[in-house]
Amino acid sequence: QLEDRGMSLNGVVLLSSIMNYGVRQPGYPQNFVTLLPTYSATAWYHRKLAHPAATVGEQVQRARDFALGPYASALAKGHMISDAERAEIVRQMSELTGLSPTFIDNANMRVELSSFRKELLRDRRQTIGRLDTRYLGLDDDASGDSPEDDPSSSAVTGAYFGVFRDYVANELNYKTDVEYRM
C-alpha cells in the first residue's frame, strides 16, 4: 500500500519504546515514583538492604506501596514539605533502596537512574546494568556521577545483533551488502 501512495521502503528505523518523553521533564515526579520499586528489587538482589523482605516480590510490593503513597505525596508537596516529613521519607527511601540518607537527601529525594546505577555498589567499586540490574561493571573512575558503560547492554549486544540481523533478513526479506553497525 505504501508504494501505491508513492512511498517506497528504503530501510528500517528502530526507535525507543518510550511513548512520552514528557515524564522525564524536571518537576514531573512520575518517573521517580515508578523507578523506586525497581531500585528496591535491585538492592534486594545485591544484598544492600538492612531489613530485606523474604522474597523479591514482597520487597517490590513494599516499595510500590511506599512509592504510590507517601513518596508520591511528598514529591507533590515540593518545597512545601515539612522538615520532619522530608526526613521520614528520606529514611524510608534509604531502607528500601540501600542508598545512604545523605545521598538521597542531596538528590532532593529524586534519584536518577544513572545515579542509582553508580551509587548502589560504589563501596565495591562496581556499577549495575541499565537494562538488567543483575549485571555488574567496573568503572575506571569510581568517583563519577554515572556509570561509564552499561554492563547489561554489553552482555547481550552480540545476541541481540544476531537475532536482529536474522529477523530483518529472513522475516522482513531485507537483503543488503551494507554493513549494519550498532
Where are the model-predicted features located?
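Alpha/beta-hydrolase fold catalytic core
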Residues: 78-182
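A catalytic-pocket lid/entrance helix-loop region that shapes and gates access to the active site
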Residues: 2-101
